[in-house]
């Protein structure tokens, strides 16, 4: 077998009959499989050992040779080669067909490649191939031309003969009629009898005339057909064809079936045809030109690839190796077999029957029928069901053909090549492990023993607990006591990977150091639940074991959970305290008025109380029970840094140093909280709402190394749980308080609602107005009940505490629980004007319960649909962007995009742009940012973090030019500088990072949170699509629902207001032609926008509009934006529109991820005029390739090609990729492979997918060449330092943050002999 690491590209082409015979190890002649008595393969059958190799290692069929020493000998009795049995997986056979057949992919695919090549309509092609019509394959024009006059004379003679015969017959009949009439006259018969005789006579004469005319017409038809006879002409009438052959057989040849197609292809001159088509394209117009373009694609493919089109008609069919279509015996003595064997058997049976019929010299009609059946059976083998009814097996199930084995989720590509099952893995239920450090997980003992079995066995032998591996294995299986000690030793420092399905983004797999735990559940650290989206209601997780040293190093350095605190989508920490931890920290940092031990200033009769000289003294007081942690006190601090303003005031320019004392007015709880933060972090004297905690951790992530952040969040977790248990926050029925004012509030709104009802009954309001009025009334009522609820609840109510701290839930839920549910929607998404007045505490009435179920059920159904849709969106995004990898450090481009940092107000103050987090943050600056005085605030090439952005805003800079992947000029992939900071690490992105996949995951992962519904926006006739459908619409570059026209030019508007439509005319400023937009529906309102005078109002007559401005409400069509404003604008438009959907759901994704996808959508150019290049007009070419080819042509003095940028949807863009392996494994497998084979496509293996498929390391991350062969030679210092890094034990998490390291260990004193 080939080793995958030794080839650089993979080519696919058409196999000719010669190729098939060369691959083959012998011909399969019989349809038999195995002998039912001996269960051994039949000779010459589908499992024959002589063709495919022996079924048992080193053993021939008859048993004459039975040892390795006979390797390579071919047995003279049975003809089987003595070799390994696994050759039955790779040796192929073939079937020699008695008549050629066409390959269904090339005849039946859309468009039909055979039809395009031969210029035949697919309908005609089908008639020829399936023996319904004859086709003329060649005509001897010269001979026909030379002998035409002779033949014409012969024809005239024949016609004359027919006419003479006719005239003679008529003459005779007329005479007979005369005689008969005379006879009747003589007999004196009645006029009636005479008329009868005359009529019958005339009728017979008419028949003679008709018969002769038919004969003449037939001769005329034959002659006309013959004179106009041309190759590729169809003759459906069999009698006509027979006549032609009888008369003029030597002047032409014709046939039916695949043989005729084969002959036509043989006579086909590809070069001449290509030249002729190019000529038509240059000079033709309309349909003719389009047809020629399509045909040229196929013809040029054969011309350039050097493929022979003969490969589309097969003389032999390959038989795949028997191990790939196995036959296994079931317990009942029956056999289960692959469907392919049935399909092959039908081919062989029909083929053998055809051979026999031909040998017997059977009539043509019988032979043709058999040939047609052979063609159909080969079709079924290649692609069952593509034409006609599929061949079915037992129970009417369509058999799986070769094509079916490749396509779809269960096909070869997606099932076995892109997703494989792996060894060294296990799965179990997860439970919470609050005692774990962030980088640890609890692994059940039994599972660990099974996973690490080989390691344990090896170590047992090393330590002399066992004599050999076999006894070590027995020890492990019997779980001897010494096994556990060895297991502890083996798993130390050996990380394992945990994965929770669905893995929506890269944080769905993280590495942890295992800790052995009792029981059978995996313990998971509470802070990584957010990233895994895990909870402990029965979720399961899978464990995988990295084996090699490299894999372990990667797991430890790149995947360890404490190195993955930041979200790759937004660059903000994911490992944050949640739920109980938030409640605990909130409780700890709350200040309660008048709590025990509160500070009181000195008075006449008493000294001041509640002042402490150190946190330790305060803690002692709390332990004695005289001080509450939530009481306000004064305390002298020396180890905690004061807040910035106090520091400036007290310590001046030098700043605070550890040990400097200052007095803080705060609570003991807040001091305890601040002691958890890193040394030197300014004191935070606030109540810790979840948002405040988040901003602190954000800040830590910006300023401190990851390791410090990891330790801090761990400490916060411990404190959070500790204080949550002491806060006594529980929920019971007694805590759900119903506001006493609820009844009177509802009564007054009832009265208002009754008034509206009365007006409706009187006819003062129509149905819609009544509904709107009622909805308004009850919305107000709900809000007021909520307000009353708020006031009624005491501050220490646990339910309110949970909501207020931001731990979970929101006030709406509290209102539903204790106040009233309010209005609910019907299945259409409209409010039902009857409110649910009860709260869940009181219980709903039957009617209320019923109307409430609508919304609840719709929500559940929505969620299910959304998950599937979102998963499919992610799959398409990954596919389109999978080969975007950081390829170089800097592409040196001068281009970039301008991002807004702030908006300047009229009074000169700056308002920070709300979207700065996702636009400017974490980018590389493209030009120096200079303030008004000309000082450089941030230099070009600097990374914009939070401090830099603050500096720019302080200097009054409102917008900067940054580098962006949209303007990156790297050929394949992007450069690190244009991409900027990697969101997940907070540093510049590494070369080799698969930023395309990260982008796809960042956009796809929140997909499940987006809504499914289309919003009905006031006044817009069409529904505005929102949520997931809108994101799909944008990425697929579809024309949006409720499409709004955009201004093609800058100019003044003339608005004409008709009955049902608007008509807008724009008079351009530059005096060019007016642009008219007709038939604009009034249901879609005119757009509101800022005018030149700064006012915001609806578009009206005489307004001035800029190019690209939207004229109506709705969404602009991205293709129009591209046409009117060019690629740069459409990129910005798409990014902005996608962000709007995500922001509406409160999801933060950085622009750069969306930009990566948009860049892939605009990678191609469609050729308008090919100039002197090889490109075909109308074809889609990669921009880089297009520019390179143009440069080459111009250098040689030719005409460059002209093209225009085109926007492709993500599905289309993934199918248009250069890699046929990647495209085939995505969708429409057979179509992609058909095309690739005709074009003799070569896959350069640049992307990730194609390398995964063939089993090479992917060219990203550590698989990239520059990282592959790294030799590590430690320096002396490193050797010394290697032993000073403390292990991940408790002292590492000591309060001094491990800044002190031990001294270097003198290694020379240690003996490195075996442990024994």
UniProtKB/Swiss-Prot annotation:
Zn(2+) 2 binds at residues 891, 968, 975, 978. Gene3D superfamilies: 1.10.132.30, 1.10.150.390, 1.10.1790.20, 1.10.40.90, 2.40.40.20, 2.40.50.100, RNA polymerase II, clamp domain, RNA polymerase Rpb1, domain 3. Mg(2+) binds at residues 535, 537, 539. Keywords: DNA-directed RNA polymerase, Magnesium, Metal-binding, Nucleotidyltransferase, Transcription, Transferase, Zinc. Its cofactor is Mg(2+); Zn(2+). GO terms for biological process: DNA-templated transcription. Its EC number is 2.7.7.6. It catalyses: RNA(n) + a ribonucleoside 5'-triphosphate = RNA(n+1) + diphosphate. One of its GO terms (cellular component) is DNA-directed RNA polymerase complex. GO terms for molecular function: DNA binding; DNA-directed RNA polymerase activity; magnesium ion binding; zinc ion binding. Pfam families: RNA_pol_Rpb1_1 (PF04997), RNA_pol_Rpb1_2 (PF00623), RNA_pol_Rpb1_3 (PF04983), RNA_pol_Rpb1_4 (PF05000), RNA_pol_Rpb1_5 (PF04998). Zn(2+) 1 binds at residues 60, 62, 75, 78. It is an enzyme of class 2 (transferase). Binds 1 Mg(2+) ion per subunit. Binds 2 Zn(2+) ions per subunit. The RNAP catalytic core consists of 2 alpha, 1 beta, 1 beta' and 1 omega subunit. When a sigma factor is associated with the core the holoenzyme is formed, which can initiate transcription. Belongs to the RNA polymerase beta' chain family. PANTHER family: DNA-DIRECTED RNA POLYMERASE, DNA-DIRECTED RNA POLYMERASE SUBUNIT BETA. DNA-dependent RNA polymerase catalyzes the transcription of DNA into RNA using the four ribonucleoside triphosphates as substrates. This is DNA-directed RNA polymerase subunit beta'. It comes from Mycolicibacterium paratuberculosis (strain ATCC BAA-968 / K-10). The gene is rpoC.
């Amino acid at each position: 077998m080939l080793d995958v690491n030794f080839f650089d590209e993979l080519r696919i082409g058409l196999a000719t009959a010669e190729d098939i015979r060369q691959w083959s190890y012998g011909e399969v002649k019989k349809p038999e499989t195995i002998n039912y008595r001996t269960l051994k393969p039949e000779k010459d059958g589908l499992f024959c050992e002589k063709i495919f190799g022996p079924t048992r290692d080193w053993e021939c069929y008859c048993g004459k040779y039975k040892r390795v020493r006979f390797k390579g000998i071919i047995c003279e009795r049975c003809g089987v080669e003595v070799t390994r049995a696994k050759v039955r997986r790779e040796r192929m056979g073939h079937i020699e067909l008695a008549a050629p057949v066409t390959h269904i992919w090339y005849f039946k695919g859309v468009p039909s490649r055979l039809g395009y090549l031969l210029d035949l309509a697919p309908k005609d092609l089908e008639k020829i191939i399936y023996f319904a019509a004859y086709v003329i394959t060649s005509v001897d024009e010269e001979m026909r031309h030379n002998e035409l006059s002779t033949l014409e004379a012969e024809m005239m003679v024949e016609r004359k003969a027919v006419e003479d015969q006719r005239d003679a017959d008529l003459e005779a009949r007329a005479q007979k009629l005369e005689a008969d009439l005379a006879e009747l006259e003589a007999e004196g018969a009645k006029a009636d009898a005479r008329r009868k005789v005359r009529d019958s006579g005339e009728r017979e004469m008419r028949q003679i005339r008709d018969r002769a005319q038919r004969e003449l017409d037939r001769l005329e038809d034959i002659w006309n057909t013959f004179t106009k006879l041309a190759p590729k002409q169809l003759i459906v009438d069999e009698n006509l064809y027979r006549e032609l052959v009888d008369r003029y057989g030597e002047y032409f040849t014709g046939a039916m079936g695949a043989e005729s197609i084969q002959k036509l292809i043989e006579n086909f001159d590809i070069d001449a045809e290509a030249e002729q088509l190019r000529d038509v394209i240059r000079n033709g117009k309309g349909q003719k030109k389009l047809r020629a373009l399509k045909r040229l694609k196929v013809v040029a493919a054969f011309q350039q690839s050097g493929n022979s089109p003969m490969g589309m008609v097969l003389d032999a069919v390959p038989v795949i190796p028997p191990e790939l279509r196995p036959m296994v015996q079931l317990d009942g003595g029956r056999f289960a077999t692959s469907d392919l064997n049935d399909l092959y058997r039908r081919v062989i049976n029909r083929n053998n029957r055809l051979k026999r019929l031909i040998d017997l010299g059977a009539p043509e009609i019988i032979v043709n029928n058999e040939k047609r059946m052979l063609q159909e059976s080969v079709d079924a083998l290649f692609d069952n069901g593509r034409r006609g009814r599929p061949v079915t097996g037992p129970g009417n199930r369509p058999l799986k053909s070769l094509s079916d084995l490749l396509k779809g989720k269960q096909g070869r590509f997606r099932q076995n090549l892109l997703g494989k099952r792996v060894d060294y893995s296990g799965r179990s239920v997860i439970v919470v492990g609050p005692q774990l450090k962030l980088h640890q997980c609890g692994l059940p003992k039994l599972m660990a023993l099974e996973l690490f079995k080989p390691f344990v066995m090896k170590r047992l032998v090393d330590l002399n607990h066992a004599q050999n591996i076999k006894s070590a294995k027995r020890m492990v299986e019997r779980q001897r006591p010494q096994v556990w000690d060895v297991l502890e030793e083996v798993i130390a420092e050996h990380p394992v990977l945990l994965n929770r399905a669905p893995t929506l983004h890269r944080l769905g797999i993280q590495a942890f150091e295992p800790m052995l735990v009792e029981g059978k559940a995996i313990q998971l650290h509470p802070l990584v639940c957010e990233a895994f989206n895990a909870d402990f209601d029965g979720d399961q997780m899978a464990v995988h074991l990295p084996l090699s040293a490299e894999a372990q190093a990667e797991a430890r350095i790149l995947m360890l959970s404490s190195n993955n605190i930041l979200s790759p989508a937004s660059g903000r920490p994911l490992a944050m305290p949640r739920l109980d931890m938030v409640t605990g920290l909130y409780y700890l940092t709350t200040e309660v008025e008048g709590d025990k031990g509160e500070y009181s200033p000195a008075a006449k009769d008493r000294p001041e109380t509640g002042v402490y000289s150190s946190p330790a003294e305060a803690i002692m007081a709390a332990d004695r029970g005289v001080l509450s942690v939530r009481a306000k006190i004064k305390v002298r601090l020396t180890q905690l840094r004061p807040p910035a303003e106090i520091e400036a005031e007290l310590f001046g320019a030098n700043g605070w140093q550890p040990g400097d004392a200052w007095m803080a007015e705060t609570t003991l709880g807040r001091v305890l909280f601040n002691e958890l933060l890193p040394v030197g972090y300014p004191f935070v004297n606030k109540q810790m709402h979840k948002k405040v905690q988040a901003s602190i951790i954000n800040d830590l992530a910006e300023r401190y190394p990851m390791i410090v952040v990891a330790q801090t969040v761990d400490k916060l977790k411990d404190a959070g749980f500790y204080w949550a248990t002491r806060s006594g926050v529980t929920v019971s029925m007694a805590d759900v308080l119903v506001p006493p004012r609820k009844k009177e509030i509802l009564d007054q709104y009832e009265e208002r609602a009754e008034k509206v009802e009365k007006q409706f009954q009187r006819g003062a309001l129509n149905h819609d107005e009544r509904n709107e009025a009622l909805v308004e009334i009850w919305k107000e009522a709900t809000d007021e009940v909520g307000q009353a609820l708020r006031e009624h609840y005491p501050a220490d109510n646990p339910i309110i505490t949970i909501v207020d701290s931001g731990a979970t839930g929101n006030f709406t839920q509290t209102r539903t629980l204790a106040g009233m549910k309010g209005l609910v929607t019907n299945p259409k998404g409209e409010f039902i004007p009857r409110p649910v007045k009860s709260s869940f505490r009181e219980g709903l009435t039957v009617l209320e319960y019923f109307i409430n179920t609508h919304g609840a059920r719709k929500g559940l159904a929505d969620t299910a649909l959304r998950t599937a849709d979102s998963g499919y969106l992610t799959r398409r995004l990954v596919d389109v962007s999978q080969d975007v990898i950081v390829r170089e450090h800097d592409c040196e481009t001068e281009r970039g995009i301008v991002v807004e940092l702030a908006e300047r107000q009229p009074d000169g103050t700056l308002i920070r742009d709300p979207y700065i987090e996702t636009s400017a943050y974490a980018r590389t600056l493209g030009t120096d940012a200079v303030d008004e005085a000309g000082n450089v605030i941030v230099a070009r090439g600097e990374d914009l973090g939070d401090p830099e952005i603050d500096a720019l805003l302080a200097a009054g800079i409102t917008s900067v030019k940054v580098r962006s992947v949209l303007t990156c000029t790297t050929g394949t992939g992007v450069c690190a500088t244009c991409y900027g900071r990697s969101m997940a690490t907070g540093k510049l992105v590494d070369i080799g990072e698969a930023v395309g996949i990260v982008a796809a995951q960042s956009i796809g992962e929140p997909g499940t949170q987006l809504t499914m519904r289309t919003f009905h926006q006031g006044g817009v006739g069409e529904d505005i699509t929102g949520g997931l459908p809108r994101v799909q619409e944008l990425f697929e570059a579809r024309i949006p629902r409720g499409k709004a026209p955009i201004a093609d030019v800058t100019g003044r508007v003339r608005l004409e207001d008709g009955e049902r439509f608007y008509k807008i005319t724009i008079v351009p400023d530059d005096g060019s032609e007016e642009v008219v937009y007709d038939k604009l529906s009034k249901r879609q309102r005119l757009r509101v926008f800022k005018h030149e005078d700064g006012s915001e109002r609806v578009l009206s007559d005489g307004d001035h509009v800029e190019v690209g401005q939207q004229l109506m409400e709705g969404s602009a069509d991205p293709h129009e934006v591209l046409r009117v404003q060019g690629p740069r604008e459409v990129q910005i438009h798409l990014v902005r529109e996608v962000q709007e959907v995500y922001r509406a759901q409160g999801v933060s994704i950085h622009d750069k991820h969306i930009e990566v996808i948009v860049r892939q959508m605009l990678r191609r150019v469609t050729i308008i005029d090919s100039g002197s290049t090889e490109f075909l007009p109308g074809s889609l070419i990669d921009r880089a390739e297009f520019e390179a080819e143009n440069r080459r042509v111009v250098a040689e003095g030719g005409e460059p090609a002209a093209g225009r940028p085109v926007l492709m949807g993500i599905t289309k863009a993934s199918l248009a990729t250069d890699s046929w392996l990647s495209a085939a494994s995505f969708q429409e497998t057979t179509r992609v492979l058909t095309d690739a084979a005709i074009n003799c496509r070569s896959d350069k293996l640049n992307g990730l997918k194609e390398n995964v498929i063939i089993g090479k390391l992917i060219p990203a991350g550590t698989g990239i060449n520059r990282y592959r062969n790294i030799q590590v030679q430690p320096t002396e210092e490193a050797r010394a330092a290697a032993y000073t890094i403390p292990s991940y034990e408790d002292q590492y998490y000591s309060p001094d943050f491990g800044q002190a390291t031990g001294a270097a260990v003198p290694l020379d004193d240690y003996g490195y002999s075996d442990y024994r």
